[in-house]
Amino acid sequence: MLKSTARKRKAPSTGPSGLQRRVRARKEEVDSEIDESSNPSENEGSERSSDEDEEDEEPKASRSSKSNLDMASISFGALAKAQASMPKRSKKESAESEESEIDDSGSDSGNESKYRKRGGLAKRSSKHAPTEMSSKRPVSRKREIFQVPKVEARDPRFDPAVNSGGSNFDEAKAKKAYAFLDEYRDSEMAELRMEIRKTKDAAQKERLQTLLQSMQNRKKAAKRKDDEKRILEEHRQREKDLVQQGKQPFYLKKSEQKKRLLTEQFKGMKKKQVNKVIERKRKKVAAKEKMELDQLQRR
């Protein structure tokens, strides 16, 4: 089939129509020569241009016919081999060519390409690569001319003016200024005792007793702390006086401080109360030792 089509395409078109065309063209040339002889100055330029056009058209027509004949004679297998032998275009090159085609096509496509160049659209070098986006952001039109100082919340728990960690903090002054809180706590404890006596609900009574016990323990701990500070202050004042007399200073150890605190604590107690406190202390120490022994046995 391919050979027959090639032969058909190769065969030149010879017929009466072709001869008539040639005859007509020659007749027209004779007429034009007669016109030129009548008016030679006007038709010289037109003759030259027509001759040149005919000369250009003849080789173009011959070239196109030759190329068509050559392509028709080539088999599909040869075309496939030629295409396979040609270097393949990468995706990047094809994308760039597409972008260039888009840039060339009209004003709308030009605006789109500009938008892409600015980084408005997300790009990826390949389908496995992460999406690349521009980190540039438009600057806000709002401008801060006068900087307003930031209002920060003041928490007294972490305020150096309130805590003892501050350099200018005076604990004695603070305690004197907030002495009314101790009186307020004492009145609260008295109200709790009255409620415990009046209430008949066992659960409510137990809850009020635990609250009263915690308040009493806090008061005792504060009193013990005050006693420790008072003993240390007395000892320091005594040592200052002795140093002025020319003696060596003596610094109290922690164990010595505890002994003096216990003696101060037992001074205002009766013998029965002292025995009770000592027994409670002994039980506490025994329970602690027992717990430590159990932990050692488990290991």
UniProtKB/Swiss-Prot annotation:
Its main location: nucleus. Residues 1-11, 115-127 have a biased composition (Basic residues). The keyword rRNA-binding does not apply. Keywords: Coiled coil, Nucleus, Ribonucleoprotein, Ribosome biogenesis, rRNA processing. Residues 141-158, 224-242 have a biased composition (Basic and acidic residues). Residues 96-106 have a biased composition (Acidic residues). GO terms for cellular component: 90S preribosome; nucleolus. The keyword Kinase does not apply. It is found in: Nucleus, Nucleolus. Residues 1-169, 215-254 are annotated as: Disordered. Belongs to the RRP36 family. PANTHER family: RIBOSOMAL RNA PROCESSING PROTEIN 36 HOMOLOG. Associates with 90S and pre-40S pre-ribosomal particles. This is rRNA biogenesis protein RRP36. It comes from Verticillium alfalfae (strain VaMs.102 / ATCC MYA-4576 / FGSC 10136).
